Amino acid sequence: MIDNDGYRLNVGIVICNKKGQVLWAKRYGQYSWQFPQGGIHLTESPEEAMYRELFEELGLNKKDVRILTSTHYWLRYKLPKHLVRWNTDPVCIGQKQRWFLLELTCDDSNINVECTKAPEFDGWCWVSFWYPVRQVVSFKRDVYRQVMKEFFSFVSLIQKHLI
């Protein structure tokens, strides 16, 4: 779904473990890494879209995670001009995202990036909390920085076993 300003409505997912590390996923057939994310369908809430994307991209179900928090506002990034598909109607110029912070409550072995016929990712690993901000593609960097700043206090509490 694309809004009136040309932004595709989307959810982003940060998954953390008990050590405060976050799941970092490798895009299929590329050497490009990112957090799981995906579009919101017309009839879905952001939370419903998040659970659908969680299953489609990582093979995880609602019982495998716990929602710790989400952003209370939409974050946007613009696509570089060479990535915009100008011949589509409506034209999508970027993403408008709600982000969720999840705690993985199941074993790592439940993560399956090849659970669909057209996987988004072909690998994943745990990385330190701030690592993605430095490593994500440049046009997403500001959004990642904002998300991680907002989620930092929750991950700190997990590391201290307070939540």
UniProtKB/Swiss-Prot annotation:
Stored PROSITE patterns: NUDIX, NUDIX_BOX
UniProt GO cellular component terms: cytoplasm
Sequence motif Nudix box, residues: 38-59
Key words of the record: Hydrolase, Metal-binding
Nudix hydrolase domain span: 6-149
Sample GO molecular function, one term: mRNA 5'-diphosphatase activity
Cited SUPFAM superfamilies: Nudix
Pfam families noted in UniProt: NUDIX
Cofactor(s) required for function per UniProt: a divalent metal cation
InterPro entries assigned: Nudix_hydrolase (IPR020476), NUDIX_hydrolase-like_dom_sf (IPR015797), NUDIX_hydrolase_CS (IPR020084), NUDIX_hydrolase_dom (IPR000086), RppH (IPR022927)
Enzyme Commission no: 3.6.1.-
Record's function text: Accelerates the degradation of transcripts by removing pyrophosphate from the 5'-end of triphosphorylated RNA, leading to a more labile monophosphorylated state that can stimulate subsequent ribonuclease cleavage.
Name listed for the protein in its UniProt record: RNA pyrophosphohydrolase
Organism, as annotated: Hamiltonella defensa subsp. Acyrthosiphon pisum (strain 5AT)
Lineage, highest ranks first: Bacteria, Pseudomonadati, Pseudomonadota, Gammaproteobacteria, Enterobacterales
Gene expressing this chain: rppH
